[in-house]
């Protein structure tokens, strides 16, 4: 059996210089995301979302990025889920994209706020019927006696709404407005390149290199 201590690889694919990155972190993110798409990575929009509850307990899970612009990074979920409860108590959160095949990570920190209802409505309407009904059927993060309970709830809402379920009031979008974005490129000998963008009080971005 392979020992965990022996599992390692050397990163050789690319390099990252502060003189080569875009002056704006969103443009730099878009550039790297485009490369991830061109490389046909599986679910390049999958990201770890880390939150902290009112009790100080952190939690993390994978969610999907569904929008990105100068205002931030958008995802959708149940407002009553653990992440929703955490964000209500503490809107500070972090995102992590890990693209193994490109030997890259992107880490984002910032403040999360709900998107406008119209944006949540539009995205909800674009989802497959099963996903729209699932948003009603799932009391996300709550204990449940068995899968049959969830499936029965889904059937009940399917009978109630047919093919036109409205958006549940407990479901919608969040946007993380970044204050810090770090781009990590694996390099040989664990001397990785880490270029970070730090937002100053005036809203401008300062580019810094971090020690690996």
Curated annotation (Swiss-Prot):
Catalytic activity: pyridoxamine 5'-phosphate + O2 + H2O = pyridoxal 5'-phosphate + H2O2 + NH4(+); pyridoxine 5'-phosphate + O2 = pyridoxal 5'-phosphate + H2O2
Protein name in UniProt: Pyridoxine/pyridoxamine 5'-phosphate oxidase
Highest taxon of source: Bacteria
Binding site for FMN: 61-66, 76-77, 82-83, 105, 140-141, 184, 194
Single GO MF descriptor: pyridoxamine phosphate oxidase activity
Any one of the GO BP annotations: pyridoxine biosynthetic process
Subunit organization: Homodimer.
Span of the signal peptide: none
Gene: pdxH
């Amino acid at each position: 059996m392979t020992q965990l201590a022996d599992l390692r690889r050397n990163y050789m694919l690319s390099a990252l210089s502060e003189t080569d990155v875009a002056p704006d972190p969103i443009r730099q993110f878009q550039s790297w995301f485009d490369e991830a798409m061109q490389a046909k990575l599986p679910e390049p929009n999958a990201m770890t979302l880390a939150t902290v509850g009112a009790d100080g307990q952190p939690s993390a899970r994978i969610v999907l990025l569904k929008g990105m612009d100068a205002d931030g990074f958008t995802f959708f979920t149940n407002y009553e889920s653990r992440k929703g409860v955490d964000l209500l108590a503490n809107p500070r959160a972090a995102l992590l994209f890990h693209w193994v095949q490109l030997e890259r990570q992107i880490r984002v920190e910032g403040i999360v706020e709900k998107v406008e209802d119209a944006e949540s409505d539009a995205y909800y309407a674009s989802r497959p019927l099963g996903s729209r009904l699932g948003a009603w059927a799932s009391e996300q993060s709550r204990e449940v006696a068995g899968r049959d309970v969830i499936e029965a709830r889904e059937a009940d809402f399917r009978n109630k709404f047919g093919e036109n379920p409205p958006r549940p009031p407990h479901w919608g979008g969040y946007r993380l407005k970044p204050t810090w974005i770090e781009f990590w490129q694996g390099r040989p000998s664990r001397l990785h390149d880490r270029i970070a963008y730090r937002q100053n009080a005036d809203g401008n971005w300062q580019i810094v290199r971090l020690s690996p």
